[in-house]
Structure formats: C-alpha cells, structure tokens
Regions:
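Short glycine-enriched loops at secondary-structure junctions
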Residues: 93, 120-122, 169-170
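Acidic/glycine-enriched edge-of-secondary-structure segments
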Residues: 81-95, 131-141, 158-165
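Active-site glycine/GP-rich loop and adjacent strand/helix microenvironment
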Residues: 1-17, 23, 137-351
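Conserved AMP-binding loop of ANL adenylate-forming enzymes
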Residues: 104-139
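Proline- and acidic/polar-enriched loop/turn elements at helix boundaries
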Residues: 30, 41, 89, 116, ...
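Nucleotide 5′-phosphate-binding alpha/beta core
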Residues: 1-75, 80-98, 102-106, 110-112, ...
Length: 351
C-alpha cells in the first residue's frame, strides 16, 4: 500500500520537526542529507531505523519537544540491552487513547462494559494503554495489573467483568482456573482483547471455548505509542490499523524493498503526527502482510494479517529458513496435538 499525499505531507512535517528539534533522530537525518520528502520515491529512499539505533539515544535523546511539553515516558523492557525511552506529550497520550477507543468500538465494546485490565502497568505501555482507551470510551475500568489470580477471579465474579484484557497465556491460565474452581456460571465475560504475545488458532479456540467469549487480536509496540494501533473485528479477517496516525509498509526483510499488498514481509511503521518521539520507517521485525480489499465490517481502515512471527525467530534447518509459525500451521492439522508444544532441534554429526 503506497503512501498517499496526505500521509506524505505528514511524514514531511515529522521530518521537519525532528530536524528542528536537533534530537538524536534529527541529527541522524541530517547526517544522511535528508531535508524532507515530496514523493513516494523520496519516502522509500529514507533510511530505516531499528531498536538498536534507538538505544543509542538513551536516555532522552529521542525527545523532539521541549521538556516542559513532555508529560510521561514509557520504555521497552531492555532485556537485551539498554531500554528505549519514549517521551509522550499530552497530545500523544490523548491520540493513543483515541486509537484505543476505536479498538474497543471495533470489538463491539461499549461504555456499559466493565473492563478488567490484567497486563502490567508502570514503564510498560500495556496496562495504562488499555485503561486510557477504556476511560476515553467511558467504560468502567478494573485496573488489576498482572498476577494475583485469586484476586483477579474475585473481582471478575464480584464486579461482573464483561471484558478481559490480557495476554494469551494469562487468559488461558484464567480459563483453566475458572474451570477448576467451578466458576464458569458466575463469570459474566463476553469479550476478550488479547495482545503482547503471538498465539495460534488452537490456543485461541481453547480460550474462547473455555471462557465462552469472543476474542480480538490487538496490535502495538512501545516504540509506536503502545498497544491499540490496530485490532481485529468481528469477522476475524485481519487487524484494522489507524492509518491517520501511522503509515505501515511491508518490506522484504532481506532486501529492504517494499513488497506488493498480500505478500508476507516485515512490518515497518512511520508515525504521522506524534510529538514526543516521532519515528520514521521503524523496522518492527514483526512478520505480516497487508490484506487487500475491503472488510465485510465496512471499516474504511486497512488491514494487517495476524502476526506470523518475527524475523529474529527464524531458524535455519539444513539450509532452509524456518519460522515457528510455519510449524504451527502444520501442527494445527492434527486434532490430537494440543495448543502447547515445544520445538527441539537435534544436531547429529554437526548437522
């Protein structure tokens, strides 16, 4: 999906902002002799950025606004190096809440729902993202945070939670505990918004069946606001993403060239109106594809397919590139295999 004229102008404005701010990113653009973009060709010639680049800006080098305009920071986990610190202005926080509100609305969630939020809070974007969007929607939020399953189930029963926001692994744990404790008839859940982890069809069906709820995939990453930049609809045929806030292109992860709509590749995201820390052509390493055509739900927003894995998940087996998602596609054909499995690669005689 080629960048349109409006998006191109927005990217150009983001570039001007970064250069003027003389931030880490602005200096990088100057080093490449970039002063702006006015065509698709200009845009596709822009350099990519990656998490390893952003770590070089630690702690606040990505900040593209005066400090008095920054109201919050979030960060990546930093498990493989320095964390990436992302500053937010008040407008960024509000824009994120607006996008998340759209996610809830796309999932058929209303201000009459009671939304139980189980992902973590703090520097991580997940918990507060789910909460801000629910408050923008006008729904009741039950801000549980992670763990403490006994308390989670008590609040779920006593407060009559109707929406569960969770990772796939924790929602499965809750489903198992609800069954084990005989609480199924006391639970009022009707929908689940699931993110942060890739999950297969078998796991999805198991959670849906055991909890008796509709499930929706939500997409996002800390560097680009957080969760809430896209979500699946009731037709479950991809995730609608908000192309008035972000531009998504799919590239060949080896050549870096854009691929046609419908072809699998790496997701690359550019922010269109972010203030605190704009990002241009950010390589996510997530694998997906743009789904061509309109969705049955009638939404005007384009769609990404479910995340199929990551470029850094790839294994090379006897010279063949293999992704865990490809193995999962084969395993799901066997009904006797559960949603949980382990991949072990044996090396015999050095092969």
């Amino acid at each position: 999906m080629k960048i349109n004229a409006t998006q191109l102008e927005q990217v150009n404005n983001q570039i001007q902002k970064l250069i003027k701010a003389d931030s880490f990113y602005g200096k990088r653009l100057k080093e490449h002799g970039i002063t702006g973009v006015s065509s698709v060709e200009d845009f596709e010639a822009l350099p990519f950025s990656e998490k390893k680049d952003l770590r070089g800006a630690y702690p606040l080098g990505l900040m593209a606004e005066p400090e008095e305009n920054i109201v919050r920071i979030h960060s990546s986990s930093g498990t493989t190096g320095l964390p990436v610190i992302i500053p937010y202005t008040a407008k960024d926080v509000d824009d994120w809440a607006i996008m998340f509100k759209r996610c809830y609305e796309t999932a058929g969630i209303t201000n009459l729902d009671r939304i139980q939020v189980t992902p973590g809070y703090g520097l991580w974007t997940a918990g507060i993202g789910f909460q801000n969007g629910a408050e923008k929607l006008g729904a009741m939020v039950i801000p549980m945070g992670p763990g403490n399953t006994d308390k989670q189930l008590q609040m779920m029963v006593d407060l009559g939670s109707t929406v569960l926001c969770s990772t796939s692994s924790y929602s499965l744990l809750l489903a198992e505990e609800i069954e084990a404790r005989g609480l199924r008839d006391k639970i009022k859940l009707r929908k689940g918004v699931i993110g942060s982890e890739r999950w297969g069809e078998k796991m999805r069906k198991r959670i849906s069946d055991e909890l008796g709820i509709e499930l929706y995939d939500i997409y996002g990453l800390t560097e680009i606001y957080g969760p809430g930049i896209g979500i699946s609809c009731k037709y479950d045929c991809g995730m609608h993403y908000w192309d008035d806030y972000i531009y998504i292109e799919i590239i060949d992860p080896v050549s870096g060239r854009p691929v046609p709509d419908g072809e699998m590749g790496e997701i690359v995201i550019s922010t269109l109106c972010k203030e605190g820390a704009p990002l241009i052509r950010y390589r996510t390493h997530d694998l997906s594809r743009i789904i061509p055509g309109e969705c049955e739900c009638g939404s005007r927003f384009p769609r990404l397919d479910a995340i199929m894995g990551r470029t850094d998940d790839m294994m090379k087996i006897k010279g063949v590139n293999v992704f865990p998602s490809q193995i999962e596609e084969v395993l799901k054909l066997s009904p006797e295999i559960s949603s949980e499995y382990q991949i072990r690669i044996s090396h015999l005689d050095g092969r």
